[in-house]
């Protein structure tokens, strides 16, 4: 080997890595947030006081082989619409999802998950779990939810009661939005909202864009803990969802919230 070539590579090997600290911090962030891409890692670094641009973060992530691998698995969307079984409400939200007032605009929906269990005959059977969350459009925080093994009016009403309680001190009249699912048409549901002077709002029939904020949450939830993972019991899946909702509310940062989590954003602006 020519001496010049040897000296060149020796200098390369002896060179101190100027990005060592950043790389270690990025590895730490990804360890705690396995689904963070370069944008959220950039936001987390910014929150920690590092001055770095997005392109450099992206370059380091590629160097370390930390690109997020996305899983997709098509599944039939749960449809809670059973026809007109009660009264429907007009669409008061009209896709105006943004608000700078906490607890003023709340939305809800139901989604289903599948898990697999071996029955008494030793046969693998598919079972379902249902999630009914209520979200504050102010910061995307899940303020209440219920989880059940079958669609249940009781579980939806339980989650509704908690959402009503959490938002009780709102200085403005509240609006609770949903699709036209059977549970939201129930007389007991609309009556409870009227008792609290809460406006009821519903999406137009078969128009998921009228509740896209909740559809987006369901997509993120399933992308990060469901697609590509097999759950073998109701309890295992339920615990995973509960853990994720806590993480989503308290730790998962969003660019639109200034790289804060929903809870961090709410607390910051409550103290301003």
Model-derived segments and spans:
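Active-site beta-loop-alpha junctions of metal-dependent nucleic acid enzymes
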Residues: 127-128, 146-169
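An active-site-proximal beta-strand-loop segment
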Residues: 95-143, 150
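Acidic/histidine-rich, metal-coordinating catalytic segments
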Residues: 170-186, 204, 260-261
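Mobile genetic element proteins and their domesticated derivatives, centered on retroelements
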Residues: 6, 26, 41, 57, ...
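RNase H-like polynucleotidyl transferase catalytic core
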Residues: 70-74, 176-180, 194-213, 229-232
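C-terminal domain-tail junction helix/linker
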Residues: 187, 194, 220-272
């Amino acid at each position: 080997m020519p001496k010049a070539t040897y000296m060149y590579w020796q200098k390369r090997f002896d060179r101190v890595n100027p990005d060592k600290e950043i790389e270690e911090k990025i590895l730490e962030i990804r360890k705690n947030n396995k689904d963070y891409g370069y944008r959220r890692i950039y936001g987390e670094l910014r929150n920690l006081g590092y001055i770095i641009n997005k392109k450099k973060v992206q370059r380091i992530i590629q160097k370390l082989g930390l690109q997020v691998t996305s899983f997709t698995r098509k599944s039939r969307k749960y449809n809670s619409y059973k026809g007109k079984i009660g009264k429907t409400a007009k669409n008061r939200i009209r896709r105006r999802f943004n608000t700078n007032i906490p607890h003023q605009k709340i939305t809800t929906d139901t989604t289903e998950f599948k898990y697999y269990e071996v029955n008494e005959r030793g046969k693998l059977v598919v079972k379902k779990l249902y999630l009914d969350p209520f979200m504050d459009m102010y910061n995307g925080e899940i303020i209440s939810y219920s989880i059940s093994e079958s669609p249940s009016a009781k579980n939806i009403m339980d989650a509704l009661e908690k959402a009503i309680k959490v938002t009780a001190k709102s200085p403005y009249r509240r609006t609770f939005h949903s699709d036209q699912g059977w549970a939201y048409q129930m007389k007991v549901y609309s009556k409870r909202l009227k008792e609290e002077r809460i406006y009821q709002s519903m999406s137009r029939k078969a128009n998921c864009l009228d509740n896209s904020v909740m559809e987006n949450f369901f997509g993120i939830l399933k992308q990060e803990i469901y697609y590509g993972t097999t759950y073998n019991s109701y309890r295992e899946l339920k615990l995973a969802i509960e853990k994720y909702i806590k993480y989503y509310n308290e730790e998962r940062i969003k660019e639109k919230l200034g790289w804060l989590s929903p809870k961090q954003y709410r607390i910051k602006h409550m103290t301003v």
